Amino acid sequence: MFKTNTIITDNITLNEFYNKCIKEKVLAVDTEFIRDNTYYPSLCLIQIAGENFAAAIDPLSGLEMQPIWDLLANEKILKVFHAARQDIEIFLHLTGEIPKPIYDTQIAAMFCGLGDQVGYEKLVSNFLDLSINKENQFTNWLQRPLTKNQIEYAISDVTHLIKIYPLILKLIKDLNREDWVQKETKYLTNKNLYIIDPLTAWEKIKIKQTNRETLNYLKYLASWREIECKKRNIPRNRLIRDDVLANIANLKPREIEKLKKIRGISNKLSIDDCYQIIETLKQSSKYNSDQWPHINKTYKKNNIDKCSLELLKLLLMYCSEKSGLAQKLIADTEDLRNVLHTPHKNHEIFIGWRNKVFGNYVRTLLDGKLAFSVENNKIKLIKF
């Protein structure tokens, strides 16, 4: 028989729990996972809370998990997460679908003036005036059996969250920002956000200034690594580190013996892996220069006036404080550089609510019709 605030390890209890959940309009959901040694996160626990009950579901106990997948897909029940992105990634990988509908309290908190990427601890402190016991924060959730304290810690994440939801919802309604939160949350439900195209994997590798030919080799080496790591379910750097991959692209060895002499090549790299790397380099060399990747980011350091960028940062800080919105939610440094590089393009900051709280000011500043002054130790804007 299902008892609240316990861990579920058998199918009968899971079905009883499911029958309680489907009567709810709102469920708080959280997960515990480990990603140290795998490409995909290893799901260790799912915590779910309704208004007056909660449980942790153990996916490692051989449960038939379909009732949980059905709950997550049930569009009549709102699923409330905090910092939902990683949870969604797990569920998408396991089921092929994203939970619907969802509400992310971290996104909502950023619209309430609580700062950038509000942590769960801060959220609980602000809304419930409680402190979280961090004793089990770094638990190895793959270990079994879990202790009573571990289970209670995991479940408390959702029992707090289900109480926070109506409070933060009221605050968002009072601020008349429901549509803003909804639009930002919708971004999380785009499957493309979680699917990495192997041919774009190279873009996340931090490298020093290089030429397009080397980038071409890096593009296909990174693509090969991405595909292999997915197949083997191992971290990228477990196969080959980023810096080593960049060195291979730069040196372009055509023989296995020369490849193995490159610093950082692991002895664990099999002969077959070495052969595939050499073959990837050979195939990469067949592309014409007009097919090589473009170095789109060179303008950032060379052609952007630093003073102009700092002015936009100051304006962003001002607009953030004035609106009570997190700076990161409005724009980041990359956005500001892009605006300075192509000011007439319809950038994200010139659309919707961002335009209202920030974009309009940016246009006025770029048109030379906005100035800064200081009055009583506070920044003041002057429009011409």
Please place each PLM-identified region on the residue numbering.
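N-terminal accessory regions of nucleic-acid-interacting proteins
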Residues: 1-27, 31
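Non-catalytic, usually N-terminal nucleic-acid engagement modules in DNA/RNA processing proteins
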Residues: 28, 37, 45-48
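Single-stranded nucleic-acid-binding OB-fold domains
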Residues: 33-40
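Accessory DNA-binding and partner-docking regions appended to nucleic-acid-acting proteins
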Residues: 148, 168-384
